[in-house]
Amino acid sequence: MNRPSLSTLAILALLSLALLGLRMFEFTVSGAGLHVDEAQYWLWSRDLQWGYFSKPPVLVALITGSTAVFGDSLLGVKALAMTCWVLSAWVLGCLAYRIGGMRSAVFAGGLFSATLVSGLLGLSVTTDAPLTLFWALSMLTLWQAAHASGYRATCWWIACGLSFGLGVLSKYSALALGFSALWLLAMAPAGQRRRIFLGGLLACVVAVWVLLPHLAWNMANQWPTAQHTLEITVQETGSTVAQGAGGWRRVLASGFEFSFGQLLILGPSVWLVWFWLWRKQRDDSRHSGALSAGLTEENGHALTASRLWSPLTYALAFSCPILALGLIQALNSKALINWSVPMALGVCLWLACWASALRLSLTRLVWACGAGLVLSGFIATSGDIKQWMGLTTQPHQSKWDIWGRMRGWDASLQSLKPALEPYREIPWLTGDRSTLVQTAYSLRALEPKLYAWNSDGGVHHHFEWKQPWPANAHDPAVVWINPSPPHPLLLSRYPHARQLAGAQSGRVTLQVWLLQTQPTQP
């Protein structure tokens, strides 16, 4: 296999840096702030732990590193998460190179970079960023381990276990990699299965060692992350959906919504390349055996003799299991199209190897990637898409703006800052998680003492668990910052209340109250 030249690698590296710069520019132009979850992760990153109420720790550690290097600005919070998507494309390209040569690598990395999931989620700080990177690393290291021998194979299996473990510490859906591994074990040649099985056991042992601190943290804290995950998956059964409005029609609608969403997040680049390949293979029967055989390298020699799996088999193993689990979950509760994000890696790998086998021109790749990048950029920067379609958004209707929930927080909180600053030394209470985390981020210069309060005393999110307002608190005065006025139960403890200020921007409406046990002395 011909090695890529340094000039080729340099060009690809420059294109990757340009893509990262484009993503940062798109987010800046969008005018969006942090999503509530992003602000929550940022707040968690102030206190590194081996786990959190609803998420494992890798993304939070990533934000800690990002802000340590780039500061606490919006792009500073997002920088390393954005970089994960670019690195994922490189890792996928490296795998495609090992399977089918440089042409396959360029197609794989380019296609993945141009998907809508990379172009839009790539602007956000989500657990999908490190998950996708470690999923790609698991794909690469497993391939390398299975095709190596001796000491090199052992090192690759250890690397595979590290990738798997860190993937699970990014997002629990990485456990679906276990089904991918079983798929590949079953599809491997009979004479190789024992070696692959033993190597897989070594990888599992390494992964367990990686997970031990997180498991110990969960055990010490009564398994909050595991319980939260079960609550939003297993315990929300199909009967819960079926008994709701619409019955089983709602179940089917949820499944259809999820399935259609998977087609959408691949974007036009993937579907254009698929169409061109389908038409090319149909029109040229000389290449009809290329896909089933695997692929041919640039020098024309068959690569299948030393390969344990065909590119199609390998790609399906890393796409179908997580797609199936996502569909099951969609039928059980509701459809979230990002549940199966790593499936895009397998799809792009398959198309890249197919494109290399059929010698699809790089010009077609450029056009396809251009279409994907233009569409994702338009969606990211256009605001309310209804306006572009000549539609008017009524006051009671939602806008077609993917950043709608990220707008208005900073403007509202900055307008409240003068009213809040004199009270920075006393506790600030809120009954709304979004308000708590957005206040912590936007007014971080004030270092507010924020506490979660609710009337039932239950634990519904991380801050009601770790930062609850104690029932026996004796503070003579507190600040209430919330979308709604103070609850009567809270007013019974602090009967002297006066509103200090209010603010509204976009969807965000906030009120600030000073609550006291005794009236202010004149």
Task: Map each language-model feature to its residues.
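Transmembrane-lumen/periplasm boundary regions of multi-pass, lipid-linked membrane glycan transferases
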Residues: L166, G178-S285, A305-A330
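Transmembrane-helix motifs of polytopic, lipid-linked glycan transferases
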Residues: A79-G100, L137, T141
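Short acidic/glycine- and proline-prone juxtamembrane loop motifs at membrane-interface regions
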Residues: V117-L131
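Membrane-interface alpha helices of multi-pass inner-membrane proteins
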Residues: D47, A108, C155-Y172, V206-V208, ...
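Membrane-interface transmembrane helices that cradle and orient dolichyl/undecaprenyl
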Residues: Y97, R103, S138-W156, A186
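Membrane-proximal, lumen/periplasm-facing interface regions of secretory-pathway glyco-
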Residues: I337, L362-Y423, S434-V437, Y441-K449, ...
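Specific aromatic-rich, kink-prone transmembrane helix
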Residues: A89-V91, P130-S149, A159-F164, V347-W350
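Short helix- or helix-capping micro-motifs
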Residues: S16-L19, A108-L116, F164, V168
